[in-house]
Amino acid sequence: MKMLDLYGYTSIAQSFDKICISIASPESIRAMSYGEIKDISTTNYRTFKVEKGGLFCPKIFGPVNDDECLCGKYRKKRYRGVVCEKCGVEVTSSKVRRERMGHIELVSPVAHVWFLKSLPSRIGALLDMPLKLIENILYSGDFVVIDPIATPLSKGEVISESAYNQAKDNYGEDSFLALTGAEAIRELLVRLDLHAINANLRVELESTTSEMKRKKIVKRLRIVENFINSGNKPEWMILTVIPILPPDLRPLVSLENGRPAVSDLNHHYRTIINRNNRLGKLLKLNPPAIMIRNEKRMLQEAVDALFDSTRRSYVSNKAGSVGYKKSLSDMLKGKQGRFRQNLLGKRVDYSGRSVIVVGPNLKLHQCGLPKKMALELFKPFICSKLKMYGIVPTVKLANKMIQNEKPEVWDILDEVIHEHPILLNRAPTLHRLGIQAFDPVLIEGKAIQLHPLVCSAFNADFDGDQMAVHIPLSLEAQLEARILMMSTNNILSPSNGKPIIVPSKDIVLGIYYLTLQDQVQSEDEILFFGDFSHVEYALHNKDVHLCSQIKYRMTYCNYDTSDGKPSYYSKIIETTPGRLILWQIFPQHKNLTFDLINQVLTVKEITSIVDLVYRSCGQSETVEFSDKLMSLGFKYASQSGISFGCKDMIIPDTKTMHVDNASEKIKEFAVQYQDGLITRSERYNKVIDEWSKCTDLIAKDMMKAISVYDVESKLNSIYMMAHSGARGSASQMKQLAGMRGLMAKPSGEIIETPIISNFREGLNVFEYFNSTHGARKGLADTALKTANSGYLTRRLVDVAQDCIVVEYDCKTHNGFAIRSVVEGGTVVETLDNIILGRVAAVDVYNPITEELLVKAGELIDEAKVEKIKIAGLDAVKVRSPLTCEAKKGICALCYGRDLAIGDVVSIGEAVGVIAAQSVGEPGTQLTMRTFHVGGTAMRGVETSNLIALLDAKVKLVNSNIVEDKHGNKIVMSRSCEVVLLDSVGNEKMRHNVPYGARLYVDDGQLVKITEKIAEWDPYTMPIITEKTGIIKYMDLIDGVSINEVLDESTGISNRVVVDWKLHLQGANLRPRLVLIDDNDNIITLSNGLEANYFIPIGAVLNVQDGQKVHAGDVITRIPRDSIKTRDITGGLPRVIELFEARRPKEHAIVSDIDGYVEFGKDYYRSKRRIFIKPVSDTLSPVEYLVPKGKHTIVNEGDFVHKGDLLMDGDPDPHDILRVLGVEALANYMISEIQQVYRLQGVRIDNKHIEIILRQMLQKVEIFEPGDTMYLVGENIDMEEVIKTNDNMVKMGKSPAKYAPILQGITRASLDTNSFVSAASFQETTKVLTEAAFSGKEDSLYGLKENVIVGRLIPAGTGFLMNKIKKLSLLNKEDYSMYYNNEYQDSALLQNDNNAFNQELHKDTGNIVDY
């Protein structure tokens, strides 16, 4: 252990391997106690000494002052261990007052409020009595029959006091035993035979049929089994002894004015002691029963208040009310509780904070530290140096010297901070880049200087932000800070692997200006240069300008030569002096050619250049390059003199024309609406669309006008800022010089009158009011959503914190097939982007040449992605954290590349926390960003057609087509897809075409780019006839199932189907349209069913009774709701909903099997029955109930596949998991979550979401227990079930069958194996109650548990230390060799050193195995 102490291991935190929790028995409480307390006195009011025998008694709890007894007879260390014969106090350190406990012997037992009131009540469950009855026994004086002896009463029957007296009179005093209060409950609990109850419940469970009863029995059975297995006795839930906390944990402090400030706990203890003593005295006097009962009830209430005051029934003691006293539970719960305030977050010594200012002349690894701060922070270091050099003899003088700021002090400070990294942190620390290490540079002034490039990582700006400084003290801490946390080592973002140290704002503007090129009038103006020094000379003499067009002889290098030596050749290129200046700072590498920067560079290009430099030249080159890029950018941004005035906002001349055109169209819509051709919501949607189009057109024209190059004034300044990506965006420019456009109401609806003015013209009063209306919502949202997002991050971290990389390869061959992501026909995420940095699960071949591209188990890096791209593959099977088979964590290969480094993740990396931060961090940013567009409605025009984006061949899937009377092809299938194939036959795009769309192409037809393939009405859902015939109304009765709805503004009436169930005569109606032929016979459709069209509530009928219709005609239409704007405020709740795995409010029904749709003849409680008839006759049909008024998206006779939706709405993720399995669930969740983030332009790697999903899928539900002890419907940890099943198979018994279940992140965090982690998360009292009666053990696997008990976390450097610690506990002499670096890298990280692993997996006694 000596060696371990060197490595920062404290003996107390290391001296145990697990933590167990159980209910304290009266004996164990007495054993822990140092004496009983009977007196309530605290301190003497005159001498302020603590009273003997009181709540602070020194005889029981230990001396108040170090090594000094109360009376003062013994003082000095030499008397340690002596007990003073005068005052009875043991002479020892006063620290024992923090650990010695006392106790109170209760005269009458009381119930422990946690086991009584925490739902489900454990006492109630064991006794099988409702909580109300138990409360009546405890508080209201009801009696319970313990033993009926010779009376007809039954055991456990609760009788009132009057009934008790009556029974005594009837049957005699001793003919039965009935008690009241806690004694009665205790007596019942003592008499319980848990094993018998267990056996009976299992028998009962076999025979019961009711689901409710089953659940109740299972709950009770679990509690009984937990009691049996944990060794707790039920009667311990009733207290006969109460422990008293050590006095220094409930101190008595005197304030300045001499009044004492007392901890609330002391108040509770005084009440209990007073009531207990009073009850003791009363019992000796033999008073009336009512007095005793009252006194006992008061004692019970006092103890309840001590343990948990919030659970008490009367109001004066609710938290927050005057006179509320904090109970023990309150000290653990919530943000201010022990767990979150003191154990998970601690205040740190050697720290300071100050305002930050920009330090443009710093290097990337430096930060400016004010001298004053440095002097204070490094004071102890300076003191020791001053003493060491003999400048001062004592520390006291050294302090004085530092105070007077003598010159020697500054010299020593310089020496001390040399190469001593410091940590800078900016709150809120949303991801790991919120704390980074820098080398301090001493500066004058009082503000910390920060390097401009790290601002985006900290999310810092210089408008008054503050940052905190921390000093790593120990050598190991300095080492970790320098190697892992230095700002130069954090160039890539851990969430998406793109550089985060990228220029922004002014720097981008400077570089953009540097790479601009003037347009020349004639070829004669272009000058030739052969050397860069000539260019500089010409610039100096003002012969050329930075942006002038010149010709230059550029020397190129050819690296691919036969002899391996690079060869050089020259080439004349057209460029500008500015670009040549930029070229001078580039590092030399074959991937970095001049063509990269021989163009105008905007933010996007600059980012990709930094990325390329990192991938090609490595880290140190990138850091130098970034620093040079920054200084260039700043220099030329200031030289350019870019500024803008009002005239720079050019309003396009076409604006009035576009606005007039839109107004005309809107008048047309109004006329159509008044003529009854379109409904109100259709008109609204069309108006919104028209104005959106108009705004976009004006914006386009404005961008055209503003981006025109003018010889005199060169480029427009505003355009340069927006185009370069330095500041502002197209949408902000649109509002400045175009037209503000549509605004949203706080409810999210769009106001249909747009703001036609822009900010340059100024808004009129009406427009101004409209815009404040939406903008105010943005501000309110921000405030509310920040809290929501922070809470989401907290839950994510909690659920993922114990996911650590534990081994290199778990040897699995499972994985997911990954395809590119297509939304609305466009590829939003290409395949190469998604598979980069993943590991192939199977060998990947080129389909044409059959060349092996990637071996199974190999990392797919940039080079391999390029090969896959060339091969034209549309799917690749890769390994995923979801399919990883590692125990207690995941393996490096299933995770793939560590995005922050660009190589396979190292063992011990805390990937769970990184995933949680990556998903949570943008949430906070996005919510703060809602109002940046000023509340203008950001809504794309609804897609209503499908256009070919490339020349391709059309393939139609599931297309059931009819021709209407105009010869148009109408799609009748619900699952029609148009697939576009390239010349080789590879699928390039796949689109869903909705039911009722018009198709303009045939199967196998070749289409040209921009050709229209199909179009449809996005605002209504039609119902279309398949055959020609005559319409007949069935069950469509005026006033019952249809109403003429008169539109007041138009005077035209529509026939709308209403809820017929609300009408008396409507009970058995099934409103539908029937198609008949001329002989009144119902027409049969192609699938052999009759032509019945069932009409949902809210549909508008387009046909009259008896009207003749043609195939392909629309007979009814269902209007869709007007679309609300979607921003992350819609998005964040969506992300939360998905991660919490909540069932959507009106979720779509998913088909469980393949089969044909059949509509039931009757209704079930106003729900419509749908049957899916399976293809094979051996299976029975599955029935579904669709709520009334919901539109089913299938017709009678349609064939549906397993997993297809039967009605509108979002599917329930639980259904997807149950029907289609884990891979389909993962695809659904990832695409839904990514969609929300993509809307905001945030990139998150899929693997982060997969890790969170892995944590949500840890539990399984047992549906056949086999020979195991599990119960049907029980949720158990998957690893545990697999282990149990393995044992069962070995013993030749039948294993349990189970299905995976999806838990929300909150549920999953609370159900974790570690009760310490769960208790510190939420519902602390409930978690601890549950853990205590189950006798749970916490093996301290996760990060949180280890932080709480004060150990190194088992991740990163701590992961290695844990392995070494295990070996050292085995007392092996040779474990020191594991400190050898090369050995450590190869053996520990690759996990291939058999000897090492065998050593660990031997029988290690009480050692936890990782």
Swiss-Prot record:
Assigned EC number: 2.7.7.6
Residue positions binding Zn(2+) 1: 69, 71, 84, 87
Residues reported in the UniProt entry to bind Mg(2+): 461, 463, 465
Record text on cofactor binding: Binds 1 Mg(2+) ion per subunit.
CDD domains named among the record's database cross-references: RNAP_beta'_C, RNAP_beta'_N
Pfam families in the record: RNA_pol_Rpb1_1 (PF04997), RNA_pol_Rpb1_2 (PF00623), RNA_pol_Rpb1_3 (PF04983), RNA_pol_Rpb1_4 (PF05000), RNA_pol_Rpb1_5 (PF04998)
Catalytic activity line of the entry: RNA(n) + a ribonucleoside 5'-triphosphate = RNA(n+1) + diphosphate
Sites where the protein binds Zn(2+) 2: 810, 884, 891, 894
GO biological process, alphabetically ordered: DNA-templated transcription
SUPFAM superfamilies named among the record's database cross-references: beta and beta-prime subunits of DNA dependent RNA-polymerase
Domain of life where this protein originates: Bacteria
Record keywords, A-Z: DNA-directed RNA polymerase, Magnesium, Metal-binding, Nucleotidyltransferase, Transcription, Transferase, Zinc
GO molecular function, one term: DNA-directed RNA polymerase activity
GO CC annotation terms, alphabetical: DNA-directed RNA polymerase complex
Cofactor: Mg(2+); Zn(2+)
Keyword Metal-binding included in the entry's annotation: yes
PANTHER family with a match to the protein in the record: DNA-DIRECTED RNA POLYMERASE, DNA-DIRECTED RNA POLYMERASE SUBUNIT BETA
Subunit structure, as described in the record: The RNAP catalytic core consists of 2 alpha, 1 beta, 1 beta' and 1 omega subunit. When a sigma factor is associated with the core the holoenzyme is formed, which can initiate transcription.
Entry function: DNA-dependent RNA polymerase catalyzes the transcription of DNA into RNA using the four ribonucleoside triphosphates as substrates.
Protein family (similarity comment): Belongs to the RNA polymerase beta' chain family.
Protein name according to UniProt: DNA-directed RNA polymerase subunit beta'
Organism: Ehrlichia chaffeensis (strain ATCC CRL-10679 / Arkansas)
